[in-house]
Amino acid sequence: MPDTKKTFNSISRVYNLINNIISLGKHKKWKKRLVLGHAIKGNVLDIATGTGDIVYLIEEYWKESTLYATDPSNKMLEIAIKRNVKENVIFSESYCEDLHFNNSFFDFVTISFGIRNTKSINNALTECKRVMKKGATLKIMEFSKSENIFLSLLTTTYLFLIIPFIGLLFGKFKEYYYLSSSISNFYTPKQFEEILLDSGFKIKEIDTFNLGLVTIYTVTKP
């Protein structure tokens, strides 16, 4: 796996634009789906915050929360901080596997399209659980590997022909080929559910949508 900090620093300036292109603008609706349906009061952490899309949705819908956001890419964080006009979010640079927070600190944790890029998913989940209060919720949104052969073929074609080509147009072929590979190599919803259970979480809901290609996993710390 390449250094994710280096990869995301490299694509930080084109990240939002290319996200809109390759998702056909749908990623904004997906992220809103992650946030809606909750009224959170307390400490909230957005991991792998990137350029801050989830942060701004949380600010809009969870107005009584205290919001923290982390990412390993300092360049992505610079953009997120500039976009944060309310200046009420505590940003910090860290990997998911090494969060700089006390034990049992957060009431709610979110990770949007970031868990697959961790160096160790098991270590990342263990660290998430460490900083969560008992009964706290973790919501992870990630691309899913389809078990439908036809959809799997279409997805593979899109991942390894279309997305890297779009990256190439912006001079970022290597970075977007890696991101396509990380999507292709991720788990089916059932496989990732087992990983979450093995990490000690309690499954609350698994919501798969967009033809089974995106899944939101809602789990709690017992």
Locations of regions flagged by a protein language model:
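A short glycine-rich, Lys/Arg-flanked "PGG" loop and its adjoining helix->strand segment in the class I
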Residues: 122-137
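C-terminal alpha-helical "lid/dimerization" subdomain adjacent to the S-adenosyl-L-methionine
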Residues: 2, 141-195
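Core SAM-dependent methyltransferase catalytic element
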Residues: 199-222
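A short SAM/SAH-binding and catalytic strip from SAM-dependent methyltransferases
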Residues: 107-120
